[in-house]
Amino acid sequence: MVDNGIDPAVRTEPRKGAQAIRRALAVLRILAAGREEGLPLAEVVRATGLTRPTVHRIVHALIEEGIVERQDKTGRYAIGGQVLELALARPSRSPLLAAADDVLRQLAQRLGDTLFLTVRTGNDTLCVDRRIGSYPIQVLAIEVGARRPLGVSSAGVAILAAMPAQEARKIVAANQARFAAYRTDASGVLAQIAAARRRGYTMREVGLVQGTKSISTWIKRPDHRPVAAITLSAVRTRLGPRREPELAEILLDAAREIEQAIRPAVR
């Protein structure tokens, strides 16, 4: 055995540090899904799979840094104001958002129903844009900034369907404990992914709001990895079997247009 003079404890520090950072980010992603209402500590423990003492230490360290806040009335934990201040340091608008801007606006005007742009972030989806159409009844189930586990929305299923099968199964397994809150399970999500691959798009017969339906198509980066999804949501009577193929083709064309626009400089 070679003695290089380095304390074994020192050699393990970088690995432990990276693990601590990943755990803290996992906690932050779960808290982000709670939005302004926040989440109880028990929910964060369940969703992350970490022990309660570990989550407690992480949360209170993040509170000290202003990254997390504890709500006085409810005792729940939520994302803190320091996160917004850090986000303001981003130097420019995302090329994806810029490319999708006109496409979403034109689609909302043409189709009359609500359009969403959703991106993948880790094992979650994040709604980054929403456009309201002219039809009197609009489906507004998801707000910009809403975060959900990959697989519980039609956008999430579309993104998973565009991934290699093994990678998609791994994410579904990781999110399994979180699915119950959305009245679904891993087997149901996997079945929807398989159906989306056969169709070339996702058709959700029952949307996040009762009496609604949604269609989603994936958007791929130049390296062919899915980066986002476009979703059209409407009341069920607006998405019947006759209109579905037409709308799906329109969304597929829109996705291809965005893919072409982001080809030089996606990030």
Which residues make up each language-model segment?
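Cysteine/selenocysteine-centered motifs that mediate thiol-based redox chemistry or coordinate metal-sulfur cofactors
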Residues: 160, 167-170, 255-267
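Extended hydrophobic
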Residues: 182-255
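A structural signal for short hydrophobic beta-strand segments in well-ordered beta-sheet cores
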Residues: 68-70, 117-118, 219
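Amphipathic alpha-helical effector-binding/dimerization core
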Residues: 73-174
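Amphipathic alpha-helical regulatory segments at dimerization interfaces
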Residues: 30, 99-110, 116, 195, ...
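Short, solvent-exposed recognition segments
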Residues: 3-7, 136-210
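N-terminal helix-turn-helix
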Residues: 2-93, 97, 256, 260-264
